[in-house]
Structure formats: structure tokens, C-alpha cells
Amino acid sequence: AYPVASDVSIQRVINLAKNSNFIIRLDNLDGAALINKAAADAGITIQYTIIVNAGLNRFGLKPDKVVEFADAMKQFANLKFVGVSSHPGHVYSATKHDEIAKYVADEKNSVATAVKGLEAAGYKLDIVSTGSTPTFWGSLDDENIKIYHPGNYVFCDYIQMSIDIAKEEECALAVYATIISHPDEETY
């Protein structure tokens, strides 16, 4: 995930929005202004969700800042608010399965804070989405989350194996290689 801010990327968004039920995720007003202008020029409205930071700190707004951002987004006539989305990617710092519950709690709490704040401010949320493969099973019982996007869940990989989310036979692909040189411990 990365912000859409170049002319080429924004044009892709416009083309997708013209030809599909496209929803963009936003977390800053500068990017929103660029996309809104392009949407206005194209005569379309683009749906968006606000990205909620569940703890990864790579993108998204802190849950208690979401209402303020939603209010500021009202200035953009060609962007339509449809909900919130998140990604608890910080779960990948877990080194064992027992640690995952903490990240599930972060995910649930951040989404709940954002949802409750927005609903109290009068916003209607059609979409409340979040997900990562490690947190998927632990978040299924959440009353706020409506859409799950569990990442590489259908493929699995060594990361999932390292925290006991998947077994080797559940991974969709195995790559076998021959090591041709390993002269010392500091050379890969």
C-alpha cells in the first residue's frame, strides 16, 4: 500500500472509477485534493474509505483523529465517504503464535474507536474492513468488522509458518534451490 499522488497513478484511479465500483483508501488531505480535482475534471465521484492506523505506523490515521479527518474531507465534492479500513501489519513483528492475540486486540480496538467516533458524529459506514493473515481467525467475532482482507491467507508462506499460522504443506508454492557457495558465516 502506498499513496496515490503521481499524475499517472491518479489517472489509473480515474479510469478504474469510471469502469468499476472502485474504492480508494485515503489518509491525507493533500492526496485527497489531487484525486478530487482529477475526479471533478473527469465528471465522476470516487468512493473512499479512511485508513485507520491499527499500530503498524506505516499509514493511516490514529483512531481518535478519524472524525476530524472525515469532517475535513467534506470539502471535496467528488469524493464520497463509504467507511473505514485498516491493516494490522505490525503483527508480523510477532515471533511466536502466542503473541498474535495482542495484535488482534490492537486491530479490534482501533477499528472500534474509529467506528464509534464516526457513528457518534453522524457518519454512516457501509464498509468496515481490515485484515491480515495472522489476525484473521482472532478477529472474526468482532462486532464492527464487516469485510476481511486476510492478505496472503490463500497462499501462505514462510512468515505464516514461523508464527504457526500455516504448515509447510499448506503453502501454495515451494521453491527448491541448490546452494552453490557458502564460504563463511557472513556471506549469504
Language-model regions, residue ranges each:
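Active-site-proximal beta-alpha core segment in soluble small-molecule metabolic enzymes
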Residues: 1-93
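Active-site anion/phosphate-binding pocket segments in diverse small-molecule metabolic enzymes
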Residues: 98, 102-188
